[in-house]
Design a protein with these regions (language model features):
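Conserved donor-binding/catalytic core segment of Leloir-type glycosyltransferases
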Residues: 4, 187-204, 210-214, 224
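Membrane-proximal helix-turn-helix segments that form the acceptor-binding/catalytic region
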Residues: 77, 103-104, 127-144
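Short His-centered aromatic/hydrophobic patch
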Residues: 88-94, 112
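A short, active-site helix/loop in glycosyltransferases that binds the activated sugar's phosphate group
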Residues: 139-163, 170-174
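Nucleotide-activated donor-binding/catalytic signature segment of Leloir-type glycosyltransferases, i.e.
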Residues: 235-253
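Aromatic "clamp/platform" in nucleotide-sugar-dependent glycosyltransferases that forms part
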Residues: 273
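Short hydrophobic beta-strand element within catalytic cores of glycosyltransferases
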Residues: 290-293
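Conserved acidic donor-binding segment of nucleotide-sugar-dependent glycosyltransferases
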Residues: 305-316, 325-331
């Protein structure tokens, strides 16, 4: 059986790592897997032995994914006799491409990581449009995979569509020498900073972390927010952090730079309003870091069975402040939570 995964970015991070790791697990179990990604150039490479065919696209993810889906069609049609399943990274943009591949005898499925209409950056009209497009897409998509039981319930309750659940996962870190100067370059203090890494989007509530950090005088500690701040929301949170030199924006972090931050932080923070199954949180847990999190279903699904985490309600600055202070005052006791994870 040969499965082709389509829709990953050239850097296997965040939600993209779900696609790469799924392909890798299939390969380990004796199945053929192949990834089609988008990036800055056309090339063929590999990820831990999984072949990757990369297509050059322009713009952001929202414009790159539909372009990739269309660019992949000639290859899929040409090699249709060798391909059993085509798995698309998103449902919404995959309707027409998946119909085409099915016409040529291949099976198709699509992944739901999160529901776009839940993001607070969208107004009422846009949310209605997103929900209408998702409803239409799901009507034409036979096989749907999602990343958590929580998300499967949300999709069923909202759209009456049943999904198969393939949970997110991350590889446990290995000890290796890191080739990065991210700590020195940004004057980040080892073991003295709160960390969050991810897509810079209003749904992540970074302003809550910033307000909590600024309102309590964290003189000896830092808050590090990793991600691409070159968008409207990014500019807003940078402006909000002004006047506090201990809030640091190192930009997009991959590879060794990301490992260095995860390895040396004191706690990993995720205060989102909504998540699929948060890979960023799993990465923080894999390094034994204390989770500072919001009480939302997808995070509860990950943490509550272990009875760990410092919890807050969504957008509650006071509770986040209390959690940060607790870590600073009682780090040696609370760090056991991270080790338990």
């Amino acid at each position: 059986m040969r499965t082709v995964f389509i829709g990953a970015h050239e850097e296997p991070n965040g939600v993209n790592s779900y696609t790469y790791n799924l392909a890798l697990e299939l390969k380990k179990r004796g199945f053929e897997s192949f990834v089609m990604s988008f990036g800055s150039c056309n090339k063929v490479t590999d990820y831990k032995g999984v072949k990757i065919k990369q297509y050059r696209t322009w713009g952001n993810t929202m414009t790159s994914i539909p372009v990739l889906y269309l660019k992949s069609l000639p290859y899929l049609i040409k090699h249709r006799k060798e391909i059993d399943m085509v798995m698309y990274q998103t449902v919404t943009f995959s309707v027409i491409p998946s119909l085409i591949v099915r016409l040529f005898g291949m099976k198709s499925s699509a992944i739901i990581h999160s529901l776009a209409e839940d993001s607070p950056k969208h107004g009422k009209m846009m949310k209605k449009l997103l929900m209408a497009s998702m409803r239409l897409a799901l009507a034409f998509t036979k096989n749907v995979v999602t990343v958590s039981c929580t998300k499967a319930k949300e999709v069923y309750n909202r759209y009456h569509k049943s999904c198969k659940v393939l949970p997110c996962g991350v590889f446990l870190p290995i000890n290796k020498e890191l080739n990065t100067d991210i700590l020195e370059k940004n004057e980040i203090q080892v073991g003295k900073f709160f960390l969050t890494i991810g897509r810079i989007d209003p749904i992540k509530n970074y302003e809550v972390l910033i307000d909590a950090f600024k309102r309590h005088n964290h003189v000896n500690y830092q808050l590090v927010i990793g991600g691409d701040i070159n968008n409207a929301y990014g500019r807003t949170i940078v402006e909000r952090a002004k006047g506090c030199k201990n809030i640091i924006f190192p930009g997009i972090v991959y590879g060794d730079a990301k490992i260095a931050l995860l390895k040396n932080c004191m706690a990993y923070c995720l205060v989102s309003s909504s998540e699929g199954l948060p890979i960023a949180l799993l990465e923080g847990m894999s390094y034994g870091k204390i989770p500072v999190v919001t009480r939302i279903p997808s995070i509860q699904e990950v943490l509550e069975k272990y009875e760990i985490g410092l919890w807050s309600t969504v957008k509650n600055v006071e509770e986040v402040i209390a959690n940060m202070i607790a870590i600073e005052k009682d780090f040696n006791t609370l760090k056991v939570q991270g080790k338990t994870a």
